[in-house]
């Protein structure tokens, strides 16, 4: 049986010493299980450093999935996160995208991006 999966996308304000503004669009999407979804994180001009992706599910603490090291153009996964589940890439200098692959019911939640330097 195919279940419809709702993935709610949102953005977390940056929170650290030397923060950059994120310009996020909050939206929700519904995708079929087994399909993919894409989340966009728009960064303010001149943003650099580390861009973090989080998942917050009801009743649980937010979980960091991965971060993108813009200095070295590489993605670092959190321990326990499946390497094939998420794909992150910089589509432009001020735009980072996260692709969620092979969606399952447990992927439901609020996805956030946040950035800071140092």
Swiss-Prot record:
Gene3D superfamilies: Immunoglobulins. Keywords: Adaptive immunity, Cell membrane, Disulfide bond, Immunity, Immunoglobulin domain, Innate immunity, Membrane, Receptor, Signal, T cell receptor. Residues 18-118 form the Ig-like domain. It is found in: Cell membrane. SUPFAM superfamilies: Immunoglobulin. It comes from the Eukaryota. The keyword GTP-binding does not apply. It holds the Pfam family V-set. Disulfide bonds join 41-113. Residues 1-17 form the signal peptide. The keyword Membrane applies. GO terms for cellular component: external side of plasma membrane; T cell receptor complex. One of its GO terms (biological process) is innate immune response. Gamma-delta TR is a heterodimer composed of a gamma and delta chain; disulfide-linked. The gamma-delta TR is associated with the transmembrane signaling CD3 coreceptor proteins following the stoichiometry: a single gamma-delta TR heterodimer associates with one CD3D-CD3E heterodimer, one CD3G-CD3E heterodimer and one CD247 homodimer forming a stable octameric structure. Upon activation, gamma-delta TR complex associates with FCER1G to initiate intracellular signaling. V region of the variable domain of T cell receptor (TR) gamma chain that participates in the antigen recognition. Gamma-delta TRs recognize a variety of self and foreign non-peptide antigens frequently expressed at the epithelial boundaries between the host and external environment, including endogenous lipids presented by MH-like protein CD1D and phosphoantigens presented by butyrophilin-like molecule BTN3A1. Upon antigen recognition induces rapid, innate-like immune responses involved in pathogen clearance and tissue repair. This is T cell receptor gamma variable 2.
């Amino acid at each position: 049986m195919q279940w419809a999966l709702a993935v709610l996308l949102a953005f977390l304000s940056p929170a650290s010493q030397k923060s950059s503004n994120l310009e996020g669009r909050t939206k929700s999407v519904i995708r079929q299980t087994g399909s993919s979804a894409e989340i966009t994180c728009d960064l303010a001009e001149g943003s650099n450093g580390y861009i973090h992706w989080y998942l917050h599910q009801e009743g649980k603490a937010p979980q960091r999935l991965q971060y993108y090291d813009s200095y070295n153009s590489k993605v670092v996964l959190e321990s326990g996160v499946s390497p094939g589940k998420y794909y992150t890439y910089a589509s432009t200098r001020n735009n980072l995208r996260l692709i969620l692959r092979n969606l399952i019911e447990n992927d439901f939640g609020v996805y956030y991006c946040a950035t800071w330097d140092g």
